[in-house]
């Protein structure tokens, strides 16, 4: 996956394009190559280095059977992220982060259990409900599914959270920091590298940039998953 062509591929996927110099975080200076036409250009050599680091970490997590939650409120990548999570058997949240998702885990778990009840036992009782009760039931199920469908199989707080769009996810970051949940982030030039454990300096606004990174992450997650499957078979 990592070869001589990767920087060229990153360039065409627009990973190098940062924000205008009027909108940046000085803490990202180390990862900037230059300024061009008023925009900061991300150093792709460093992007390769940190992407390798993240991919190796993710592969290790997969081998150990650890679970990752992917979080992004970027509407343009919702379908891709859902598909990605299904393929890698991960969890996802694509709506605005609900305060207390982690810090009030008992309430979150209650909502997940209720959604799963509607999906299984609720269907059995559906025919016995009145028209009004069915309407109320559908509304409640729809509301729960909006926020919890991507984590309905999550039995506990995940081992790692992968954030896409750090500037939109302050609540999620705050809860991860409070509970010492490790995070991985794609960091654009307006982001803060001190607010995450692992990161990839890259354009986090471009769909092509995000998809490029997710494809690498998927490859290493599945690679790690195959190793754990073999280990389970031979043990």
Swiss-Prot record:
One GO MF term attached to the UniProt entry: structural constituent of ribosome
Gene Ontology process terms (BP): translation
PROSITE patterns reported in the protein's UniProt record: RIBOSOMAL_S2_1, RIBOSOMAL_S2_2
Coiled coil (residue ranges): none
Pfam family, one: Ribosomal_S2
Family designation: Belongs to the universal ribosomal protein uS2 family.
Domain of life (superkingdom): Eukaryota
HAMAP family hit by this protein: Ribosomal_uS2_B (MF_00291_B)
Protein name as it appears in the record: Small ribosomal subunit protein uS2c
Gene Ontology cellular component terms for the protein in this record: mitochondrial small ribosomal subunit; plastid
Compartment(s) where it occurs, according to its Swiss-Prot or TrEMBL record: Plastid
Keyword line: Plastid, Ribonucleoprotein, Ribosomal protein
